[in-house]
Amino acid sequence: MRSIVIHGHFYQPPRDDPWTGAIPLEPNAAPFHDWNERIERECYARVAASLASMSFDFGPTLLEWMEQHAPGTYAAVVAAGRAGGAVAMPYHHLILPLSARRDKVTEVRWGIADFRRRFGREPEGMWLPETAVDDDTLDVLAAAGIRFTILAPHQVQRAPEGGLPGWYRTGGGRRIAVFIYDGAISHDVAFGPLVRDAVAWVERLTATPNRLVAVATDGETYGHHHKEGDVVLARVLETLARRDDVRVESFATFLARHQPEEEVRLVAPSSWSCPHGVERWRAECGCRAAPERATQQRWRAPLRAALDWLSGELHAVFERQGRALPPELERQALRMFTSCGWFFDDIAGIESVIVLRSAARAIELAGAEAPRLEAGLLERLALAPSNDPSVGSGRELYLTRVKR
């Protein structure tokens, strides 16, 4: 019998002010207060009833917001996850191949701890932010007890036949299962016609001879990116459930019955959303949200270098003076690497401002070291040019829109 897994990656960047914990009014989310509220109404509340039949992950920071502001939807997500379909995610949405080993370990451990607290069990799988992967990242996952992850077809040199998972053996001698989702079907759900046509979607899923057909998209595809996408998803799941020739299940249940038989080799570093590996989060690789606009992304490398420098300094300060400093310093030092800060087209965008606010808050919490750290950060941000002449560089952006 053919197995089908439909995975949704549900995530929003942390929008809360790192000083107050509250999300400022976001006028472009009207008639809602902010984008979290709007997307919860358009997507999360509507797709919750389908989660029990899916594989899914929710970003821990999104669940933290949902627990406080959408408790009904949160309860439905937790109930579905406890039934077995949920997989974990690192605590923040960092590009792990660009992170130091200690930060990878921290993010994975925090993600597992958050999952355990919410879902009452150990996670078997973990979704990687942007599916960004390298050998060290998978070694950290395997060392933490994670049994599998999910990657795009172009992230392995050769996928096992039949849609089956493969073993990956890390440089550290550990082993982890890797599922490869169907790239063509997933693309046509996320960006093409299938999310509007349940009949065509079911036909595509059942036409392949593969023993496993896995689809993976952003969860916001269903209702937010595509109005009524949640309705089509529900129809697809209901139709498949009535058939006796397919089994709709999770990656974990499939893995319990079918251990990998082949080994896979990574294309690394790589991700699902940048054909240049992970360059979108550290360089002007050509990837941008609005390719029709003639913008530069020369700011990405200086922003990454500035925060890498600050991270090293903050970790050193915390290790020397940890007992005298609040642990919140370390949380903000990780949160400032949220991937959205580099994903879009200009350093003056709200996503980059958010990561710089976390950097500013971490500096503030460093006590007597704060003036030195801020001066060093500003020196490096001066090398990050905005596309907006009225903004100038990252230095001016920090001083006018970030610093308190």
Regions flagged by a language model, labelled:
Residues 98-109, 131, 135, 196-199:
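Short, amphipathic alpha-helical segments
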